[in-house]
Amino acid sequence: MAVKNTSCMLCVWDCGIKATVEDGKLVKTEGMPEHPVSMGYICPRGETLPHYVYSDSRLLHPYRRKKGGGLERVTWDQALDICAENLTKVRDKYGSKALAIFCGSVGVENIEVAAFAQRFKSAFNTPNLLSVENICYRMRILARQLTFGRYTGEDYKDAECIILWGHNPDGSRRMLGDLIREKVNDHKMELIVIDPKRTELAKLGLHIPIRPGTDAALGLAMMNVIINEDRVDREFVDNYTKGYPELVEHIQQFTPEWASPITGIPVTEIKTIARIFAQSDASCIIQGINTLDQHQNG
């Protein structure tokens, strides 16, 4: 029996795991305490990796559908020939742009497949490469690139105030949830949870049960408060941003009084969370994947 250090590849967090191998077979997975990010945590998906690897439903060989129904196993050479023949027919009849490629995730957990898909796309001369990002977090990446110049991450370890905006770390990012609990219990952090659901973490801080789909209105009203009460870090704004005067003018219409009936949040609470967020020396917002990305007002 041997224990190997590796990582879980079932989602983008890439948590560290210790894999127990017996007679050449994976028999158990558990968290890796010394891992700098996951710190010993793995979710139920990571814990059940052996079942995933040895599932009776896992495809280990290529199959093709028979004319009368059902599937028949073919060799890899046969499968590649069938794919090449059909792809050539499509290109000859409709052009190369008729092909769309879906490669699953393009994150770190699937980077090899994503890299190959990019090369195959170029070789076939089609621009159509799709991934789960289209129904996941691509909009967030684009928004941060347009706003900050690159895709940035949250510096939550040093934060004095965290807003969990539509995010419940206990679901699949427990190490973050545990860190927040520790800092809140030690009175080292202010916690605000903006979520229609009262999660376990929401019970530790200020819970704002927003009406679903009205997040943009709340964000605009918070900016209105921060700007008009002069709670802005002017040195940062002057040195690292563009368009602030235009933002000041634009934001005047989005008052807490305007946002309150839209969001279902009292005016006093909108002002309170804006002030808490602005007065902390180190604040960050951690948004949930999909909860905001897939809505026009997210």
PLM feature spans:
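Membrane-interacting alpha-helical segments
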Residues: V225-G243
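Active-site phosphate/pyrophosphate-binding segments
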Residues: M222, T241-G298
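N-terminal export/assembly segments and adjacent metallocofactor-ligating motifs
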Residues: M1-E229, P266
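Short coil/turn segments at secondary-structure boundaries
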Residues: Y94-G104, V132-I135, R234-Y240, P261-I262, ...
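Active-site-adjacent structural elements in folded domains
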Residues: Q145-R150, V237-E246
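A general boundary/transition motif marking the beginning of the first structured unit of a protein
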Residues: V108, I210, E235, N239, ...
